[in-house]
């Protein structure tokens, strides 16, 4: 059985909602295509997972490492991932030195309070993380230009980028998150 790990940090709950929508997209696509051999797990980085600025959940890292694909998610804070997500990233250095994530599928998602809130920098940071680990990055193949009802309303192709509207997620963001989950399954099925 193949598996997907969605690892993310969320403070206000919007990144959590995106992670759950991605999980729903994976499950829906798998069920619709009679592909029940894909397991998807979410791993939320919580305050108790950080001690003295360091991510300390080695068991979580081991579970994530067992996955065939990893989808990274963080809110955009000051043009990058949150400090808590950065602590998780720093904890992957031992995984990097062993090459344990090499050739795994990777994707990413982020949310900010404004569309011009430098979310692309966050996605590029996640993409760099994946590249350093030798992972294969999956972006969105929907530019948002083909039709007006596309889920990718930001037009970003590197990953899922969205923003809140009055601290709420627009329906399009949840649809785009589901689409990202489906896309990762499609790509993963080719390996």
List each model region and its residues.
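N-terminal beta1-alpha1-beta2 submodule of the flavodoxin-like/Rossmannoid cofactor-binding fold
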Residues: 1-100, 147, 153, 161-191
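Short, glycine-/small-residue-rich phosphate/pyrophosphate-handling segment
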Residues: 105-151
């Amino acid at each position: 059985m193949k598996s997907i790990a969605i690892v993310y940090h969320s403070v206000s709950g919007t990144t959590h909602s995106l992670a759950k929508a991605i999980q729903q997209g994976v499950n829906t696509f798998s069920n619709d295509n009679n592909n029940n051999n894909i397991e998807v797990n979410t791993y939320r980085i919580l305050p108790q997972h950080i001690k003295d600025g360091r991510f300390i959940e080695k068991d979580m890292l081991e579970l994530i490492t067992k996955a065939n694909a990893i989808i990274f998610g963080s809110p955009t804070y000051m043009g990058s991932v949150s400090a808590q997500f950065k602590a998780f990233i720093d904890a992957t250095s031992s995984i990097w030195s062993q090459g344990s994530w090499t050739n795994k599928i990777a994707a990413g998602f982020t949310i900010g309070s404004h569309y011009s809130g430098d979310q692309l920098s966050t996605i590029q940071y996640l993409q760099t993380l994946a590249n350093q680990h030798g992972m294969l990055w999956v972006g969105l193949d929907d530019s948002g230009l083909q039709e007006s009802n596309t889920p990718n309303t930001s037009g970003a192709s590197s990953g899922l980028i969205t923003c809140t509207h009055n601290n709420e997620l627009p329906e399009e963001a949840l649809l785009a998150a589901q689409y990202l989950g489906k896309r990762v399954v499609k790509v993963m099925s080719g390996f």
